[in-house]
Structures are given as C-alpha cells and as structure tokens.
C-alpha cells in the first residue's frame, strides 16, 4: 500500500517538476512501538530508523513529524532523533506551503503531505518499513530516485 503511494508520488513529482515532496510520519505505532506507559516509547520498528536516515539525506524530501504527543515528549523525541541522525523539517505544521502564495490552495488548517506513514491510515509498520527500505535501496542502486537537482536540468 505505502509503496504504491511512494511510486505514484515520485512519478507525479517528476511530471509536475516539484522540487520538494512532503512525507508525514506519525510517531506512536508507526515509527516507534507503543508501550502505553509513562516511560515513553523508544523502541523503533525494524527498518524505521534505516528508512528515516535515507530520507533525511535527501534535500528534495521534507520530513514532517505529525503526532499528538505532548510538547515535552516531542522535544525528547526530537533529541533522540537527532542522536540517531534523523532530521524532521517540521513538527505538526506544513513546511514551505503558504496559503498566501495562492498557488497550492488554502492550507492554513489542512495538513499538506504527499506521502503519509500512519498506522491509523493503514500503514503496517511490522511489514511496510522493510518494503520501503528494500525499495529505496534498490532505487539507489539503479539510480531511480530523482536527482535532488533534477529541476535545474530542464
């Protein structure tokens, strides 16, 4: 399911000459395994860390952490992500999308993303992180992933 969304997004990004795409990630039950206690969730699902590290390195992919965690929990997770070499470009907001520009529509209250990783939206972290990892690695090998500077070549 998520691979279909990713491949369609890459195709559309190339077709529309988008210079950035926005990938949103839920935290609990998607990136980390929920523990349902006050100590916090700190165990990553297998391959989640690997995928997020690959995506963090791409300047054309903006990562959004989309979570209902409390502000102090978010700060703690962001510190943990930084130690794990993962960078989120935004937390619970739309990076780089302005309703004032008028070319994307009105996004002051609507969440904007191209790909959504969320267990509540059907993402199965026990299976799909590995699929996404394998896909991204195979794309790197055959150079399928778009060049971050591809728009300058047109």
Annotate the PLM regions.
Residues 1-154:
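HAD-like aspartate-dependent phosphatase fold
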């Amino acid at each position: 399911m998520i691979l279909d969304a990713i491949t369609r997004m890459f195709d559309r990004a190339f077709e529309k000459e988008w210079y950035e795409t926005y990938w949103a990630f839920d935290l609990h039950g998607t990136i980390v395994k929920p523990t349902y206690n006050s100590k916090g969730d700190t165990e990553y699902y297998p391959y989640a860390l690997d995928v997020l590290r690959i995506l963090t390195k791409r300047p054309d992919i903006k990562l959004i952490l989309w979570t209902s965690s409390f502000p102090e929990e978010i700060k703690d997770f962001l510190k943990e992500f930084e130690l794990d070499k993962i960078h989120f470009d935004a937390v619970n907001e739309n990076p780089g999308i302005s309703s004032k520009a008028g070319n994307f529509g009105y996004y002051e209250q609507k969440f904007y993303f191209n790909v959504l990783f969320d267990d509540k939206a059907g993402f199965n972290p026990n299976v799909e992180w590995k699929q996404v990892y394998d896909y991204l690695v195979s794309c790197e090998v055959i150079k399928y992933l778009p060049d971050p500077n591809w728009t300058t070549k047109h």
